[in-house]
């Protein structure tokens, strides 16, 4: 309520304020969803920061605190702009744009940005990535191992780091080139895809416009492997807006009390599972032999008989 009061002070008291409210991501939209909608209805401006976000970033606190769906809840509020960045430069770029839109352009929007409870090194900001960060995805690293087989790896939040590690294994051990895409907002990509699809349907006599996802991926080779620290419904949002074979992975199910490493293994979003799933996806496209995927499954001791995590 205090955040809403500050976020609407520009109209109620003629005082411009940009409030920043940091909270446990699980205790945001899930616990006070009515207030989030009230913020949208009242045209509040400001930043909501969902800390300790993602199903596996908060180790040891089980199902009550491990967030696998706050981004999906945020996606339903029309004037809520939501992001799931991985690195500090992404967060800074998003904050700067948010200040520009809300303070300079006077747009009646508010931002939901998730932040992880995990320490890791942050790389130098790549050149010319601001537009991609804000639109929802950009090419973090291009596979240049000159391998004959290519794959497109998409990741957001803390799981992008598992994607990066998986790409290194694929390159060194399997001679597979992976283009790594940092997806800062599956939600914004979906909104762009929906708008583009609608525009094309309303203009049947014109050349179809490409969604931003299509612009990024259409000229790239290989299937798409997308993973996040949220349920598969989060990454699945962009499936209709790419023509490529698309595989999504996430953390469907209840949270569990364990280490980050074990949690990611359980939910099958660690680097080992991503490597094995990527090889299987490539085998289905007849780009690698199925025996390579079988060997990887055995090598990483992945239990084929284990039930789907959401059923456990």
PLM segments and residue spans:
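Thiamine diphosphate
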Residues: 1-76, 82, 89-99, 164, 235-236, ...
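Secondary-structure boundary/capping residues
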Residues: 48, 82-83
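Single, functionally critical "micro-switch" positions that shape active/binding sites
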Residues: 86
